[in-house]
Amino acid sequence: SVGFKAGVKDYKLTYYTPEYETKDTDILAAFRVTPQPGVPPEEAGAAVAAESSTGTWTTVWTDGLTSLDRYKGRCYGIEPVPGEENQYIAYVAYPLDLFEEGSVTNMFTSIVGNVFGFKALRALRLEDLRIPTAYIKTFQGPPHGIQVERDKLNKYGRPLLGCTIKPKLGLSAKNYGRAVYECLRGGLDFTKDDENVNSQPFMRWRDRFLFCAEAIYKSQAETGEIKGHYLNATAGTCEEMMKRAIFARELGAPIVMHDYLTGGFTANTSLAHYCRDNGLLLHIHRAMHAVIDRQKNHGMHFRVLAKALRLSGGDHIHAGTVVGKLEGERDITLGFVDLLRDDFVEKDRSRGIYFTQDWVSLPGVLPVASGGIHVWHMPALTEIFGDDSVLQFGGGTLGHPWGNAPGAVANRVALEACVQARNEGRDLAREGNEIIREASKWSPELAAACEVWKAIKFEFEAVDTL
């Protein structure tokens, strides 16, 4: 028989290989697959492997011009999801040669590209990725990392405190700068541009940068502490984004900010490289993440977006609070917090970690807890996140009945009280409220904050459980 065998054949004949032994250089993926009725799970898993690597819907003549065995993705394992009908975890291994070095963009285009619209699947979710050390070494990663940031700021042994300036839209640059100054002067380490503050008619970016720089220098001089404001450099083009980052550096600002999902991984990686070369810290906001990660059976889990950010580069990233107004279950959140901070993370299915991940020498990222948190949450936050974190109170600072600076004082006093209590061996989980009450006796600012928020709770079940 001359030529090749044309026609359509089952994916599983080529792409389902349960006997395959994964290599150290493979990128491994765990997908939650919901096949259409009548599609066997092996075929669905193989289809995912094929469509996200070398396959197409029919045999093509040009397959003969390459070595499919060398380049194809392989579904090497399938397991049913306990408690779910017709859902499976499909494990897929991709040879490293399929991916461009140092490009999160290219990695995602393959692994979570067209395959998510594939008709034979009702739904598909990427739960986790194991990124091999060989691929990690092609990335710069975070511009500075946790230790370098602490050294730059000269702040040790406690979480850092931040505040998002509200109202998020509508303030003039001068009034915005004033709010920044008051918060920093009151005792916060950082203030933050809201993610949707870019350069709007009511406040152009250059004016905001100038007034915020003034606020930073004034509050530094008065407190003797190093201060920062996350200047949001996110823009409509990469060139404009870089222009803003360069201006921030010229002002001597310590940190800039980027919305990495709406801005895109290509822009983010460029900015991260600039930040390392020029000594700027990079704060990352995850606006749009819930569009991708909130549905349990379709999309991509945030732990994958977090890993991708560590590769692309950022020194801080928003990572949920466990206790505030935004989604995040405790064990799952702590799972990806470890993936952001630690050098080596063991597989632990109870926390949603499907693979052991070795980050080799990539710096760590500080998780940022932000969204609906206030002084009564401080003991829980200190206990859950530990020292290497940024705790951000927007309304929880600016909503103080006496104003912004007293709001900042209340948060700083609450934090210092929790850290001291923990260092003295007290149990923050059990004695948290008592610790805050004791501290409020000698801090009228904290007492006023405690009174305002004593009954506020955001209690809904988490949507994204294991």
From Swiss-Prot:
Top-tier EC class: lyase
Family: Belongs to the RuBisCO large chain family. Type I subfamily.
Miscellaneous remark of the record: The basic functional RuBisCO is composed of a large chain homodimer in a 'head-to-tail' conformation. In form I RuBisCO this homodimer is arranged in a barrel-like tetramer with the small subunits forming a tetrameric 'cap' on each end of the 'barrel'.
Protein name: Ribulose bisphosphate carboxylase large chain
Signal sequence bounds: none
Modified residue annotations for N6-carboxylysine: K192
Keyword Metal-binding among record annotations: yes
Enzyme active site: K166 (proton acceptor), H285 (proton acceptor)
PTM note: The disulfide bond which can form in the large chain dimeric partners within the hexadecamer appears to be associated with oxidative stress and protein turnover.
Keyword Transport carried by entry: no
Site keyed Transition state stabilizer: positions: K325
Catalysis: reaction(s): 2 (2R)-3-phosphoglycerate + 2 H(+) = D-ribulose 1,5-bisphosphate + CO2 + H2O; D-ribulose 1,5-bisphosphate + O2 = 2-phosphoglycolate + (2R)-3-phosphoglycerate + 2 H(+)
Cofactor(s) of this protein: Mg(2+)
Molecular function GO labels: magnesium ion binding; monooxygenase activity; ribulose-bisphosphate carboxylase activity
Gene for this chain: rbcL
Organism expressing this protein natively: Cucurbita pepo (Vegetable marrow)
InterPro entries tied to this protein: RuBisCO, RuBisCo_large_chain_AS, RuBisCO_lsu_C, RuBisCO_lsu_C_sf, RuBisCO_lsu_fd_N, RuBisCO_lsu_N_sf, RuBisCO_lsuI
Function, in words: RuBisCO catalyzes two reactions: the carboxylation of D-ribulose 1,5-bisphosphate, the primary event in carbon dioxide fixation, as well as the oxidative fragmentation of the pentose substrate in the photorespiration process. Both reactions occur simultaneously and in competition at the same active site.
Annotated EC: 4.1.1.39
Cofactor note: Binds 1 Mg(2+) ion per subunit.
HAMAP family: RuBisCO_L_type1
SUBUNIT field: Heterohexadecamer of 8 large chains and 8 small chains; disulfide-linked. The disulfide link is formed within the large subunit homodimers.
Database matches in Pfam families: RuBisCO_large, RuBisCO_large_N
Entry binding sites for substrate: N114, T164, K168, R286, H318, S370
Residue sites binding Mg(2+) per the record: K192, D194, E195
Chief location bin: plastid
Cellular location(s): Plastid, Chloroplast
GO CC aspect terms: chloroplast
